[in-house]
């Protein structure tokens, strides 16, 4: 009986731990997000996205921020701003850009900047008891209204029907903004009084549940930890984090880093970065670049805001050099998506975050197990920091090797930032061009895996099968001493392996083709199959 009790307790603990693991973030959601919250029209959103695409800066999604509806959260498009919403959504769909819509959980009687003041659903919400605090209106940052009681199942079902009006093909989720924070420290709900903090998961969980049920590739962008109110969304029901709001100066960047690190330590899987902040002070040239470089080493680069959406937030506004740097950051981040995705799947299965080993003091962190970066947060490009205490680390740019825990003191030109790869790394990539130097256009459509040999290295990769959350496991092992590279996966795939720091290569067996670059000490192997046994001599 005692053994049975211990087994039961053990199972309950495991279930509890599993329930706190973050969800899998769809592969597409790691892509660059443009955020239009300035002009707030269809033309403005199109101009923003097209501005990037015309300059060969990839965009994966666009946030349509408020006011896009006739009153907040009535889910009726304001056709004076967006004359043909379906046409706009299809326009973005034709460019493979997904649409995300802003919302909060409040229904207003007075609005700040919408076409109408009172929502056409306000009276219904109050009369049916769908609001918290007995349906009494309260002033919040977008006017005055009542907040939906997400503890009330009937209210949630009604809310979902409202969402159905706009959650159509091409719309992939929501920027779930903060409204509940303004409705009091203690709230009256359908299940009794509770603190504001206790109420928040009901709101964010409801939005997550609706979204992924309607579209398994859908996301909510929501606050994990924020200095504006603490923890918000549930760890297990938030697939993209945004800690907002921040200023665009050094102070804002430093504060955002602290927020992101706090979120990661809590176990949020995919904290992203609000590049150049959202409000108050605007980024100058140096601040914008350092923001982008830090952002590309988080889950997502989310760029836009009211502090210069069509000026300081645009890389080309700062000059051609910044445009080139920003393009590099976005493309590098895109190339890393299979690695980011695989790391977040690990976090989903075992707990943890994409961002690991974060140091508040040195403003540094690991991206997964194999990459390390340090943010530059001042106009002084000279930085001092320590590499992680475990493993040998390799400078991403020049291949210089460093012992564990090494102190790095270096001046970084604007186009460079501290980035290191752990020896023994096995990095799945999606390389489509030669922009970053990791590969070239011949790798399009292939599973590219980069290996930094260090004794015997093995990694179970979770490779995305498309844009969503589906993946296939692929076990990769490389033995530096024997020169054997083994791969085991469920289906046959076209692979390109890039092995770094290879002093010499004379022969490679059991592959379609191989090429050795003696100057770069780099070996490229092209091969196809599900079970591979490659010999390198």
Q: Residue spans of the language-model regions?
A:
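Accessory, solvent-exposed terminal regions and/or long lumenal/extracellular loops of proteins
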Residues: 423-511
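Solvent-exposed beta-hairpin/edge-strand motifs
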Residues: 386-398, 498-513
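Generic recognition of long tandem-repeat/solenoid scaffolds
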Residues: 481-489, 515-528
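Catalytic-domain carbohydrate-binding cleft regions of carbohydrate-active enzymes
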Residues: 18-416
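Secondary-structure transition/turn motif
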Residues: 388-389, 488-493, 526-532
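Bacterial Sec-dependent N-terminal signal peptides
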Residues: 1-19
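Residues that act as N-cap/strand-start positions at coil-to-secondary-structure junctions
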Residues: 379, 413, 468-472, 491-493, ...
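C-terminal beta-strand-rich structural cap/linker in extracellular carbohydrate-active enzymes
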Residues: 405-451, 518-537
């Amino acid at each position: 009986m005692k053994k049975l009790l211990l087994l039961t307790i053990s199972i309950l603990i495991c279930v509890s731990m599993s329930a706190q693991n973050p969800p899998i973030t769809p592969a597409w959601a790691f892509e660059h997000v443009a955020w239009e919250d300035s002009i707030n029209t269809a033309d403005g959103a199109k101009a923003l996205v097209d501005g990037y695409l015309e300059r060969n800066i990839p965009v994966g999604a666009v946030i349509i921020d408020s006011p896009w509806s006739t009153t907040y959260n009535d889910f009726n498009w304001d056709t004076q701003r967006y004359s043909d919403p379906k046409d706009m959504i299809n326009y973005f769909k034709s460019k493979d850009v997904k649409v995300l819509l802003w919302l909060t959980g409040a229904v207003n009687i007075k609005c700040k900047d919408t076409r109408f003041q009172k929502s056409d659903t306000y009276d219904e919400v109050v009369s049916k008891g769908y609001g918290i605090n007995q349906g009494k209106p309260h002033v919040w940052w977008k006017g005055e209204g009542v907040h939906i009681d997400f503890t009330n199942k009937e209210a949630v079902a009604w809310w979902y029907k409202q969402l159905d009006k706009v959650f159509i093909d091409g719309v992939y989720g929501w920027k779930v903004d903060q409204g509940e924070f303004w409705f009091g420290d203690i709230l009256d709900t359908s299940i009794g009084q509770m603190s504001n903090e206790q109420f928040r998961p009901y709101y964010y969980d409801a939005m997550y549940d609706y979204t992924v049920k309607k579209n398994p590739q859908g996301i909510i962008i929501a606050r994990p930890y924020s200095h504006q109110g603490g923890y918000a969304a549930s760890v297990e029901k938030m697939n993209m984090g945004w800690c907002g709001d921040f200023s665009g100066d050094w102070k804002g960047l430093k504060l955002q880093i602290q927020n992101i690190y706090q979120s990661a330590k809590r176990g949020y899987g995919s904290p992203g970065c609000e590049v150049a902040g959202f409000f108050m002070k605007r980024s100058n040239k140096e601040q914008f670049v350092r923001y982008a470089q830090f952002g590309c080493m988080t889950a997502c680069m989310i760029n836009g805001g009211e502090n210069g959406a069509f000026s300081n937030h645009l890389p080309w506004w700062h000059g051609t050099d910044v445009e080139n740097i920003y393009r590099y950051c976005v493309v590098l981040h895109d190339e890393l998506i299979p690695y980011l995705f695989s790391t977040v799947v690990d976090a989903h299965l075992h707990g943890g975050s994409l961002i690991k080993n974060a140091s508040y003091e040195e403003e540094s962190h690991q991206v997964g197990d194999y990459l390390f970066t340090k943010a530059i947060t001042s106009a002084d490009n000279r930085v001092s920091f320590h590499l992680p205490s475990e493993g040998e680390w390799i400078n991403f740019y020049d291949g210089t090797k460093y012992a564990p825990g090494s102190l790095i003191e270096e001046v970084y030109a604007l186009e460079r930032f501290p980035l290191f790869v752990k020896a023994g790394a096995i990095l799945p990539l999606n390389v489509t061009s030669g922009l970053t130097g990791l590969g070239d256009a011949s790798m399009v459509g292939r599973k590219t895996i980069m290996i930094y040999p260090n004794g015997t290295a093995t990694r179970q990769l979770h490779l995305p099968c498309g844009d969503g959350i589906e993946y296939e496991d692929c076990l990769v092992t490389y033995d530096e001493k024997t020169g054997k590279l083994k791969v085991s996966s469920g289906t046959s795939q076209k692979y390109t392996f890039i092995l770094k720091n290879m002093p010499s290569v004379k022969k490679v067996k059991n592959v379609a083709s191989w090429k050795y670059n003696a100057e770069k000490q780099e070996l490229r192997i092209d091969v196809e199959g599900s079970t591979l046994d490659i010999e390198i001599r």
